[in-house]
A protein has these predicted regions:
Chain A
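An N-terminal, globular interaction/scaffold subdomain
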Residues: 18-91
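Redox- and metal-dependent alpha/beta enzyme cores, enriched for Fe-S-associated oxidoreductases
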Residues: 14-36, 210-285
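Proline-aspartate-enriched helix->loop->beta-strand connector
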Residues: 71, 286-296
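Acidic/His-rich segments in extracytoplasmic proteins that coordinate ligands and/or metal ions
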Residues: 58-133
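A short, acidic, amphipathic alpha-helical segment used as a generic capping/interface helix at domain edges
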Residues: 60-63, 273-290, 307-308
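Peripheral docking tails and interdomain loops at the edges
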Residues: 307-353
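A charged, amphipathic alpha-helical module
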Residues: 2-9, 121, 125-243, 271
Length: 353, 416
């Protein structure tokens, strides 16, 4: 068996709660493991995780297959039930030596309040220690500030991309790929990819996508092939991702408190946010982005979006924006579900006219 | 009901009906009542004199009246999923059913719905309760199980700071204080902290009786009680935790079990194989637990309900609110999060001298295979069965009795 050489400059992440600045301060680059919309999940991954979103199973399979063994470490966010289960499983397997990557839980509950903030700051402090340990880097306030600037450059590039998208100069598929680069390659390279994201858009519906996260752009391609343009989304592989730098503060603790404050004010996610907040955010963003239709696509066993449907339907009815939803999407049913949903919207559009 | 039924089990069931009728009456007279998740800090409500109904218990009553499917259909009619976390969702669907379809006459609308944010969906269900006229929702955080030091059952009664970590406790303690303030604002009642401390003491006393009962059963040969009898005898008083009645009932169960042992009572006359049931109770076929007595001399001596009541609840400490946070901050971690789950089941299997384990694998928990693996590593054969414990269609198609028979024949030799 060949010994895998660990790359101290890359730390993997599952989920979307990572304050990337902390990893960057260690001289490493965060590399998000996304999984995929389609593909088999092995019986072993299914057995280990129990009944969860297949995307988590695909990520676990890639880890069990050794595809990420060269990472310096792996941070798993408690931002969904599926990801938390993955942490529990990998913690056991890592302790047994069956998975060679050091694994760390990042548990950052959303929302305001001093107690939550203190808990999140304590989690970030542990994350700093973990990054020091797996990279052998010194992390102090100077490194954190510099990393904050670097992260802000990614955030700024994404803001420029969102402006192009709003102006109809960047299609949803390109935007999603840019977000993917932002989350998984080194910042300088990511900025180049993001700034290059510029594609003509179609004349069909301006679509807002909510529901499950999109681990790859295959569904966006399908939606846009059908004539729509995805102009915005709230899932964490797109606009709901977290790219924010905090370069102020006199001490390490100040910077971590600053990051915790930024985290607390993030928009709500399906798995952790309240339905009322989510529906309110959707209504505001649909209006702001000039979206002409909304689509929810929720995978089987990723149930949180299904509980939001009546509230979202009501919120959109007030705006007179048509809405199509497909839930319990099977492991290989994403493309057909997205085609069905677009067709349903087009039929509604036809009947409106 | 069997001729072997424990008097404590029958008494508990009778008490529950009378208690529910009284709770309904109080609500009808205008008292605010609460609907709570099983892992919410009930003791606060008890200390503030607010009657509460546990969501999961209420779901079991609705299901037992075969109103689960109708309740779920009602959710679907509202555009909500009928396929997601059904057990927790059934009471929400049942709440608007017509009077003739309401179990035990129906649950009065609660003033408060209180839950922790476990999983992705519980908070959504409880949020929907809060949208109903006259009901408000309060949600508590549910942090991940990290750290997980070994032998949790030795640590959690007193060394809970180490067992769960101060950060997790700080957060939940602060949120319980917020809950107390929230309830005070709405009821005009303040929390008597001495009363809460007394309630914690009573809960600990109840757990101590359960521990003694569990230890008696672990050491007894032959086994003196049916597991399907200890389930209600333990679980009904659990929902009354912190009362003298619950302590007295736990003690009565202990004394009854002790008497049976002294009298040489055997639920299986010719006990040759001692079995452990890992997983939730098979509510759809409780008689299954005694089906292997005659042919195989095989008797189920263990289920988690008494054992977790013994090990999972005791929390001693000067600060009652922090001790209460310690009771709930990782309650389900004890049962379902590896490696804690596997370590505990092994400890219990060895203490009870079991010859084989039937593991009803839950698909809503991670790493169930680690439990089977750990038991097999101790030389204890395990039969894994995948089925829904509450759905008779699922358990029927899993051929549970037939597979247990095969397991007994092939892997669990009879004792001499």
């Amino acid at each position: 068996m060949t010994e895998v050489v660990r790359d101290r400059r890359r730390i993997g992440v599952v989920g979307a709660d990572l304050p990337r600045q902390i990893v960057l301060a260690a001289g490493a680059s965060p590399e998000r493991l996304f999984g995929a919309w389609s593909g088999a999940v092995s019986p072993r991954a299914s057995e280990l995780l129990g009944a969860v979103d297949a995307v988590a199973g695909r990520i676990l399979d890639s880890i069990l297959a050794g595809e990420h063994d060269d990472l310096a470490g792996l941070v798993i966010c408690n931002d969904s039930q599926a990801n938390l289960r993955m942490f529990y499983v990998l913690r056991v397997l890592a302790a047994r030596g069956e998975v060679p990557i050091p694994v760390q839980l990042l548990d950052a509950p959303r929302g305001q309040g001093a107690a939550k903030q203190a808990f999140v700051v304590a989690q970030y402090t542990r994350l700093v220690d973990f990054c020091r340990r797996v990279t052998d880097a010194d992390i102090g306030v100077d490194e954190l500030r510099r990393a904050g600037d670097v992260e802000q450059s990614v955030s700024d590039a994404l803001e420029r991309m969102r402006e192009r998208r709003a102006q109809g100069r960047c299609a949803g598929t390109s935007a999603l790929n840019a977000y993917r680069a932002a989350a998984s390659v080194a910042p300088e390279a990511a900025v180049e990819v993001i700034d290059a994201a510029s594609t003509p858009v179609g004349q069909g519906d301006r679509l807002f996508v909510t529901g499950s996260g999109h681990p790859d752009s295959s569904v966006y391609q399908e939606l846009e092939r059908a004539g729509a343009t995805v102009v915005a989304e709230d899932h964490d592989a797109g606009d709901g991702g977290w790219f924010a730098g905090c370069s102020t503060g006199e001490s390490e603790a100040d910077v971590l408190v600053g990051l915790a404050s930024l985290h607390a004010s993030r928009p709500p996610s399906a798995a952790r946010g309240s339905t009322a907040e989510r529906a309110g955010t959707l209504r505001r963003r649909v209006a702001d982005t000039g979206s002409t239709a909304v689509i929810t696509l929720a995978r089987d066993l990723d149930d949180a979006p299904a509980w939001e449907l009546p509230a979202m339907r009501n919120a959109l009815a007030e705006l007179r924006v048509p809405f199509a939803a497909r839930v319990q999407i099977s492991a290989d049913g994403a493309l057909s579900a997205s085609r069905d949903a677009v067709t349903a919207l087009q039929e509604k559009d036809g009947s409106r006219r | 009901m069997t001729e072997d039924r424990l008097a404590a089990a029958a008494a508990a069931t009778r008490h529950q009906k009378a208690w529910f009728a009284d709770t309904v009456r109080r609500a009808q007279e205008g008292e605010p009542i609460a609907l709570v998740n099983a892992d919410a800090p009930h003791e606060v409500l008890r200390a503030m004199g607010i009657p509460y109904v546990v969501n999961q218990w209420w779901a079991s009553i609705i299901s037992a009246k075969r109103l689960g499917p109708t309740s779920l259909e009602h959710l679907a009619e509202r555009g909500l999923p009928d396929f997601s976390q059904q057990y927790d969702a059934i009471p929400l669907g049942a709440q608007d059913l017509p009077a003739h379809q309401r179990a035990w006459g129906g649950l009065p609308d609660p003033a408060f719905a209180i839950a922790e944010r476990s999983g992705d969906v519980t908070q959504k269900i409880f949020e929907l309760w809060g949208e109903r006229e006259g009901t408000e929702t309060f949600l508590l955080s549910r942090t991940g199980a990290d750290p997980v030091p070994s032998s949790w059952w030795e640590k959690v009664p007193r060394d809970w700071e180490d067992a769960f970590g101060a950060d997790r406790l700080d957060l939940l303690q602060a949120e319980i204080e917020e809950l107390i303030a929230w309830l005070s604002e709405r009821t005009g009642r303040s929390l008597d902290r001495d009363r809460l401390a007394r309630i914690m003491d009573l809960g600990n006393e109840q757990a101590e009786w359960n521990r003694r009962t569990r230890d008696l059963i672990a050491a007894a040969r032959p086994t003196p009680v049916l597991v399907n009898d200890t389930m209600p005898a333990v679980m009904v008083p659990q929902w009354h935790r912190g009362t003298q009645w619950a302590v007295d009932t736990a003690r009565a169960l202990h004394d009854e079990v002790a008497r049976r042992i002294d009298d040489g009572v055997a639920v299986c006359a010719d006990e040759k194989r001692r079995l452990m049931w890992v997983g939730r109770g098979l509510w759809s076929d409780l008689d299954m637990y005694r089906r292997f007595h005659e042919e195989f001399g095989a008797v189920f001596v263990w289920s988690m309900y008494l054992a977790i009541a013994a090990d999972g609840y005791p929390r001693y400490g000067e600060d009652a609110v922090r001790a209460l946070a310690a009771r709930f901050v990782g309650f389900t971690d004890q049962l379902y999060v590896p490696p804690w789950s596997a370590e505990w089941y092994v400890k219990e299997a060895l203490a009870h001298g079991v010859d084989g384990v039937v593991h009803l694998v839950a698909d809503d928990t991670p790493g169930a295979g680690f439990i089977s693996e750990a038991l097999e590593a101790e030389g204890i054969p395990v039969l894994e069965i995948r089925a829904n414990n509450a759905d008779s269609r699922s358990s029927g198609s899993a051929r549970i009795p037939e597979r247990i028979e095969e397991f007994l024949r092939e892997r669990v030799p009879a004792r001499d």
